[in-house]
Amino acid sequence: VWDALEESGQWENTVIIVTADHAELLGDHGLKEKVGYWETSQHIVSIVRDPRKTQAHGTVVRAFTENVDIMPTLCDMLDQPVPAQCDGLPLTPYLAGEEPPFWRDAAHWEYDWRSTLIPVYPHDTPWKRHLDSMSLAVHRSDTHAYVQFADGDWLCFDIEADPTWRTLTTDPAVVLPLTQAMLQWRMKNTNRTLSGFLVEDGGTGRWPTDVAWRSATSE
Protein backbone atom coordinates (compact mmCIF):
# COMPACT_ATOMS: atom_id res chain seq x y z
CA VAL A 1 0.00 0.00 0.00
CA TRP A 2 2.79 2.40 0.88
CA ASP A 3 4.59 1.69 -2.39
CA ALA A 4 1.38 2.37 -4.30
CA LEU A 5 0.91 5.69 -2.51
CA GLU A 6 4.46 6.76 -3.34
CA GLU A 7 4.20 5.65 -6.97
CA SER A 8 0.92 7.52 -7.42
CA GLY A 9 2.25 10.69 -5.82
CA GLN A 10 -0.17 10.49 -2.89
CA TRP A 11 2.32 9.70 -0.13
CA GLU A 12 2.60 13.32 1.02
CA ASN A 13 -1.16 13.84 0.74
CA THR A 14 -2.39 10.84 2.74
CA VAL A 15 -2.94 10.34 6.46
CA ILE A 16 -1.95 6.80 7.48
CA ILE A 17 -3.26 5.01 10.57
CA VAL A 18 -2.12 1.47 11.34
CA THR A 19 -3.99 -0.29 14.14
CA ALA A 20 -6.04 -3.40 14.92
CA ASP A 21 -9.18 -4.48 16.72
CA HIS A 22 -7.36 -6.78 19.15
CA ALA A 23 -4.00 -8.37 19.88
CA GLU A 24 -2.88 -12.00 20.16
CA LEU A 25 -1.71 -13.90 23.24
CA LEU A 26 0.76 -16.04 21.25
CA GLY A 27 1.29 -18.44 24.16
CA ASP A 28 1.42 -15.89 26.98
CA HIS A 29 -0.12 -17.37 30.14
CA GLY A 30 -0.38 -20.65 28.22
CA LEU A 31 -3.09 -19.25 25.95
CA LYS A 32 -3.65 -18.29 22.34
CA GLU A 33 -5.96 -16.01 20.36
CA LYS A 34 -7.71 -13.21 22.33
CA VAL A 35 -9.27 -14.23 25.62
CA GLY A 36 -9.48 -12.98 29.18
CA TYR A 37 -8.25 -9.80 30.78
CA TRP A 38 -4.53 -9.93 29.97
CA GLU A 39 -2.93 -6.94 28.33
CA THR A 40 -1.25 -9.08 25.68
CA SER A 41 -4.73 -9.87 24.36
CA GLN A 42 -5.68 -6.20 24.05
CA HIS A 43 -2.50 -4.13 23.58
CA ILE A 44 -2.55 -3.21 19.89
CA VAL A 45 -0.32 -1.35 17.48
CA SER A 46 -1.02 2.34 16.92
CA ILE A 47 0.93 4.16 14.21
CA VAL A 48 -0.31 7.50 12.91
CA ARG A 49 1.39 9.58 10.22
CA ASP A 50 0.27 13.06 9.21
CA PRO A 51 2.43 14.14 6.24
CA ARG A 52 1.97 17.80 7.20
CA LYS A 53 3.38 17.38 10.73
CA THR A 54 6.96 16.42 9.99
CA GLN A 55 8.22 17.71 13.34
CA ALA A 56 6.78 14.66 15.09
CA HIS A 57 7.67 12.00 12.52
CA GLY A 58 9.47 9.09 14.16
CA THR A 59 8.31 10.06 17.65
CA VAL A 60 7.22 7.37 20.11
CA VAL A 61 4.52 8.62 22.50
CA ARG A 62 4.27 6.67 25.74
CA ALA A 63 0.72 7.57 26.70
CA PHE A 64 -2.51 5.60 26.84
CA THR A 65 -4.68 5.66 23.75
CA GLU A 66 -7.78 3.70 22.75
CA ASN A 67 -9.52 2.90 19.48
CA VAL A 68 -12.15 5.53 20.30
CA ASP A 69 -9.46 8.17 19.67
CA ILE A 70 -9.28 7.43 15.95
CA MET A 71 -12.47 9.17 14.84
CA PRO A 72 -11.82 12.41 16.80
CA THR A 73 -8.28 12.42 15.39
CA LEU A 74 -9.49 12.14 11.79
CA CYS A 75 -12.14 14.81 12.34
CA ASP A 76 -9.55 17.19 13.79
CA MET A 77 -7.14 16.50 10.91
CA LEU A 78 -9.89 17.37 8.42
CA ASP A 79 -10.87 20.53 10.34
CA GLN A 80 -14.27 19.03 11.06
CA PRO A 81 -16.07 19.30 14.41
CA VAL A 82 -15.76 16.24 16.60
CA PRO A 83 -19.28 14.80 17.14
CA ALA A 84 -20.50 15.37 20.68
CA GLN A 85 -21.20 11.66 21.16
CA CYS A 86 -17.57 10.62 20.59
CA ASP A 87 -15.93 9.06 23.65
CA GLY A 88 -12.35 9.50 22.44
CA LEU A 89 -9.82 12.31 22.26
CA PRO A 90 -7.93 13.63 19.21
CA LEU A 91 -4.29 12.60 18.94
CA THR A 92 -3.46 15.69 16.87
CA PRO A 93 -1.44 17.50 19.59
CA TYR A 94 0.92 14.53 19.80
CA LEU A 95 1.18 14.48 15.99
CA ALA A 96 2.36 18.10 16.14
CA GLY A 97 4.97 17.30 18.79
CA GLU A 98 2.94 18.97 21.54
CA GLU A 99 1.27 17.91 24.77
CA PRO A 100 -2.55 17.97 24.79
CA PRO A 101 -4.29 20.11 27.42
CA PHE A 102 -5.83 16.98 28.92
CA TRP A 103 -5.20 13.28 28.50
CA ARG A 104 -6.35 10.03 30.07
CA ASP A 105 -4.34 8.43 32.86
CA ALA A 106 -5.49 4.86 32.15
CA ALA A 107 -6.65 2.54 29.40
CA HIS A 108 -9.82 0.46 29.50
CA TRP A 109 -11.12 -2.62 27.78
CA GLU A 110 -13.89 -5.14 28.22
CA TYR A 111 -14.33 -8.80 27.34
CA ASP A 112 -17.69 -10.54 27.00
CA TRP A 113 -17.78 -14.32 26.55
CA ARG A 114 -21.54 -14.94 26.85
CA SER A 115 -21.85 -16.19 23.28
CA THR A 116 -19.57 -19.16 23.99
CA LEU A 117 -21.76 -20.31 26.89
CA ILE A 118 -25.22 -20.02 25.32
CA PRO A 119 -25.41 -23.83 24.77
CA VAL A 120 -24.38 -24.50 28.40
CA TYR A 121 -27.10 -22.70 30.33
CA PRO A 122 -30.86 -23.25 29.94
CA HIS A 123 -32.94 -20.33 28.77
CA ASP A 124 -34.50 -19.64 32.16
CA THR A 125 -34.39 -15.88 32.06
CA PRO A 126 -35.40 -13.57 33.58
CA TRP A 127 -35.07 -15.45 36.87
CA LYS A 128 -31.53 -16.81 36.47
CA ARG A 129 -29.48 -14.48 34.32
CA HIS A 130 -26.29 -16.56 34.22
CA LEU A 131 -25.09 -15.14 30.91
CA ASP A 132 -25.29 -11.55 32.14
CA SER A 133 -22.42 -12.34 34.52
CA MET A 134 -20.08 -13.62 31.81
CA SER A 135 -18.10 -10.45 31.17
CA LEU A 136 -15.28 -8.37 32.61
CA ALA A 137 -13.87 -4.85 32.45
CA VAL A 138 -10.28 -3.69 33.00
CA HIS A 139 -8.86 -0.38 34.25
CA ARG A 140 -5.14 -0.28 33.48
CA SER A 141 -3.05 2.56 34.95
CA ASP A 142 0.71 3.05 34.91
CA THR A 143 1.12 0.95 38.03
CA HIS A 144 -1.86 -1.40 38.38
CA ALA A 145 -4.49 -3.30 36.45
CA TYR A 146 -7.89 -3.67 38.09
CA VAL A 147 -10.20 -6.37 36.71
CA GLN A 148 -13.90 -6.37 37.58
CA PHE A 149 -16.06 -9.37 36.73
CA ALA A 150 -19.82 -9.02 36.27
CA ASP A 151 -20.44 -11.73 38.88
CA GLY A 152 -18.78 -9.60 41.57
CA ASP A 153 -15.30 -11.15 41.63
CA TRP A 154 -12.28 -8.94 41.04
CA LEU A 155 -8.50 -9.02 40.66
CA CYS A 156 -5.88 -6.31 41.07
CA PHE A 157 -2.42 -6.78 39.56
CA ASP A 158 0.65 -4.83 40.67
CA ILE A 159 2.19 -4.40 37.23
CA GLU A 160 4.77 -1.91 38.46
CA ALA A 161 6.29 -4.67 40.58
CA ASP A 162 5.56 -7.43 38.06
CA PRO A 163 4.78 -6.48 34.43
CA THR A 164 3.87 -10.12 33.66
CA TRP A 165 0.52 -9.79 35.46
CA ARG A 166 1.23 -12.54 38.00
CA THR A 167 1.45 -10.51 41.23
CA LEU A 168 -1.82 -9.60 42.92
CA THR A 169 -2.52 -6.97 45.57
CA THR A 170 -5.45 -6.73 47.97
CA ASP A 171 -4.34 -3.53 49.72
CA PRO A 172 -7.52 -1.45 50.19
CA ALA A 173 -5.51 1.76 49.81
CA VAL A 174 -4.62 0.62 46.29
CA VAL A 175 -7.78 -1.22 45.27
CA LEU A 176 -10.42 1.33 46.34
CA PRO A 177 -9.17 4.23 44.16
CA LEU A 178 -8.98 1.85 41.20
CA THR A 179 -12.54 0.62 41.72
CA GLN A 180 -13.73 4.23 41.96
CA ALA A 181 -11.88 5.11 38.77
CA MET A 182 -13.47 2.13 37.03
CA LEU A 183 -16.94 3.22 38.16
CA GLN A 184 -16.34 6.81 37.06
CA TRP A 185 -15.22 5.62 33.63
CA ARG A 186 -18.30 3.43 33.24
CA MET A 187 -20.62 6.25 34.32
CA LYS A 188 -19.04 8.78 31.97
CA ASN A 189 -19.20 6.39 29.02
CA THR A 190 -22.60 4.84 29.52
CA ASN A 191 -24.95 4.48 26.53
CA ARG A 192 -25.91 7.98 25.41
CA THR A 193 -28.74 7.16 23.03
CA LEU A 194 -30.97 10.25 22.95
CA SER A 195 -28.94 11.89 25.73
CA GLY A 196 -28.93 15.65 25.43
CA PHE A 197 -32.30 15.50 23.65
CA LEU A 198 -34.77 17.78 25.40
CA VAL A 199 -38.45 16.92 25.10
CA GLU A 200 -40.33 20.19 25.47
CA ASP A 201 -43.95 20.85 26.34
CA GLY A 202 -45.94 20.85 23.12
CA GLY A 203 -42.96 20.06 20.87
CA THR A 204 -40.88 17.19 19.63
CA GLY A 205 -37.73 18.37 21.37
CA ARG A 206 -34.36 19.69 20.30
CA TRP A 207 -30.72 18.66 20.24
CA PRO A 208 -27.97 20.53 22.13
CA THR A 209 -26.45 23.57 20.45
CA ASP A 210 -23.05 21.97 19.82
CA VAL A 211 -24.45 19.45 17.33
CA ALA A 212 -23.05 20.70 14.03
CA TRP A 213 -26.08 19.96 11.87
CA ARG A 214 -28.68 21.44 14.21
CA SER A 215 -28.63 24.98 12.78
CA ALA A 216 -28.68 23.71 9.20
CA THR A 217 -31.65 21.46 9.95
CA SER A 218 -33.70 24.09 11.73
CA GLU A 219 -33.25 26.78 9.08
Segments (PLM) and residue ranges:
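Acidic carboxylate motifs that coordinate Ca2+ or other divalent cations, activating on Asp/Glu
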Residues: D162
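Alpha-helical packing segments of well-folded alpha/beta enzyme cores
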Residues: V1, I70, L178-M182
